[in-house]
A protein has these predicted regions:
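Structured-RNA-binding interfaces characteristic of tRNA pseudouridine synthases
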Residues: 1-278
Length: 278
């Protein structure tokens, strides 16, 4: 039997998250159905992360066991021919026996994308950002107020390091032995989606929040992103963020940013964790 590691990209808009749910479309469910069509066998896959409904991925990973038959270098091609358009297998590689996508993961990078409110209006007097949201609404969190990016970067720096991140954990997730995690990097990058992306001659400004850590609590990145937005809008002081973390009190942190702005960018394993970016 071979152990196969898949790297997977998907648009989470039409799926009820990663994990299989009865009678609902999920990413895991679609991949397992594709595996059955390709191999004729019932094959269970184990994902690194259980992304929620509406969350996207560029670099989700999953492992499964398979016998002889389809060559490893043909698995991605075969599955992509059987999968819906919103799910793509980026790569498939054979790993040593016992390798597990979840338990052997050493870290992840997530990206949270904000659509910043545009200052200009079009000929009809409608803000450009409102029109842009028609095309981006499933992939960004639109923020309709100015943000103090310097304050947000100061707060982001306070989120780095090894801490008890209970303040950034939502209720309802899987029970954890500890809420202590190490966040290696929280980086904010302004980007412009250039003219030509939209039907009209306009561009969109986005702010990407990239978070790399050894593990994450339930909704942790979305709450971190919401907290940074609250810092940027003045609802939480940047200097108060260390005390918020120290409190371990969810009520003291910011709001939970919506799912559609979140992307799982990369999973790190022993051989590559800490040696690259997303």
């Amino acid at each position: 039997m071979r152990t196969i590691l898949l790297t997977i990209a998907y648009d989470g808009t039409d799926y009820y998250g990663w994990q299989i749910q009865p009678d609902l479309p999920t990413v895991q469910g679609e991949i397992e159905k594709a595996l059955h069509r390709v191999t004729g066998k019932e094959i269970h896959i184990n994902g690194t992360g259980r992304t929620d409904r509406g969350v996207h991925a560029y670099g989700q990973c999953a492992t499964f066991r398979i016998g002889d038959g389809i060559p490893t270098d043909r698995i991605a091609y075969a599955l992509n021919n059987s999968l819906p358009g919103g799910i793509r297998i980026v790569s498939a590689e054979e790993k040593p026996e016992g390798f597990h996508a979840r338990f052997d993961a050493k870290g992840k990078t997530y990206r949270y994308r904000l659509l910043l409110c545009g200052p200009h209006e079009d000929a009809d007097g409608a803000p450009q950002a409102q029109r842009q949201l028609l095309y981006l609404r499933n992939y960004v969190y639109q923020v309709n107020r100015p943000l103090d990016l310097a304050a947000m970067r100061k707060a982001a720096a306070a989120m780095e390091g090894t801490h008890d991140f209970a303040c950034f954990q939502a209720a309802g997730g899987e029970e954890r032995e500890t809420t202590v995690r190490t966040v290696y990097r929280v980086e904010l990058t302004e980007r412009c989606l250039e003219e030509g992306f939209f039907p009209e001659e306009e561009s969109a400004h986005v702010l990407d929040i990239d978070v790399t850590g050894d593990g994450f609590l339930y909704n942790m990145v979305r709450i971190m992103a919401g907290t940074l937005v609250d810092v940027g809008s003045g609802r939480i002081g940047a200097a108060d963020v260390p005390a918020v973390i120290e409190s371990a009190d969810r009520e003291k942190a910011g709001h939970t940013a919506p799912p559609q702005g979140l992307y799982l960018m990369r999973v790190y394993f022993e051989e590559d964790f800490g040696h690259g970016e997303e």
